[in-house]
Amino acid sequence: MLLTNLKLDKQTETPLYTQIIDSIKNQLYNDQIAAGDRLPSVRRLSAALQISRTTVENAYNQLVADGYLQNEPKRGYFVAALSGLRKHSDAPVTQSIEPPAVRYNFANNYIDPASFPSELWRRYLNRALKNKHLLSGYGEPQGETELRRTLAKYSSVARGVICSPEQIVIGAGVQSLLQILIDILQPDITSIALEAPGFAQAERLFTSHGWQVRHFSTDQLETSLPRLLYVSPSNPYKGRSLSPQQRLNLLRWATQQQTYLLEDDYNGEFRYFGRPVSSLQGMSDGRTVIYLGSFSRLLLPSLRISYMVLPPLLLDRYRQLGHLYNQTSSTIEQLALADFIAAGALRRHVKRLRRLYSNKNTLLRQALTEIFGSRVIVRAYESGLHLRLAVVTQQTADTLSERALENGVRILPVYDSNGNLPEILLSFVGIQENDIRPALLQLKKAWF
């Protein structure tokens, strides 16, 4: 097996994920592995190193993103051909194999294109383009004042967030805001606990900055947890929201432990039984919660506008460092979004999306019952944009995913399952309603 000399130091502060990445890069640069070499599977390497599959998978995926590896469906991970690197003269010549055609995608991060008011959005973009005075500069580093004022009002009504425009920082996506937050918190805070499963990209970002990363459950809070907890009250990977009482308990615990809660309100507006629960930030005293909001699922994934609400103490620190940052989000899109929200267009759009996704949620659950019966168990479905299922089978989640792909259906395996049954996620955002039943019939054919 390749990578037999890969050794991990589990006593050092360097994360295991980073050690794997560095070791593979070193072997590549030293000509110990070459273009076309096939790496051990995630399962095999994690077993050999006696670590979690998630750690290996995150390392492999980061190397894919950086261009060092290629992930070929049904075949595995291969060393990519990089110019400037030495190659073995006898390196096997591999032909790229076309991935299986995906007809039904339950694993995409897109939106239903028919759900977005493209013409209306174009109208607001055109209006923003007429503001030549604002467009001639780089924009406000903290984000356009007009948008921050609008967001303060909107988030108060929609999510119960209590803040002033001055507390809001705009950025091109959550990751850019997390980078700012890391700079604000260091060196006082250099460790974080995240829910599992959670936002893997956030975990990689904190890890890459040398932070110690732990996992926790909101059901089991410990006094020994770090002073920063990354919380998604409407966790998209769990398909359920924290109840008001659970949120109050979490806030009480954070106050007692003098811990910051980093609230990622991803999908917080999508709850299908009862009204969405108010944000943690709005239920708090305003000093313990850092709030993150995004428009990637409300509007477009390509609309790179997210925002962060800082408590007063961290806002002071941000102002001390503010001169170091330029705005990463488009001024044109910020101005267009401000007008879009102020005119009530976003509120009406979210209302339509709730109806659309609630209907898809119901159709998917009904079809699962009709087609699979007791062979699947819906673990969670009350909020978010996925259903989380347990499949009554001896197969692993990876095997279920592979067999589904062979039959033209893409799904997401779940790696944090605490039960004996494999679990998967089915996203119903991008799939058409009339494709739900045929897609599930293909899954049944693939699995049973």
Please state what every model-predicted region is:
Residues 151, 307, 334-343:
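Helix-loop "lid/cap" segments that line or gate small-molecule binding pockets
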Residues 111, 233-236, 297, 431:
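Short glycine-rich anion-binding loops that position phosphate/pyrophosphate groups of nucleotides
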Residues 1-127, 133-136, 147, 319, ...:
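N-terminal basic, amphipathic alpha-helical segments
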Residues 105, 170, 215, 279-282, ...:
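Structural signal for conserved beta-strand scaffold positions within catalytic alpha/beta enzyme cores
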Residues 74, 284-317:
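Active-site PLP attachment segment
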Residues 135-258, 262, 268-270, 275-287, ...:
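Conserved core of the PLP fold type I
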Residues 312-317, 346-347, 394:
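Short helix-loop capping/hinge motifs at secondary-structure junctions, enriched
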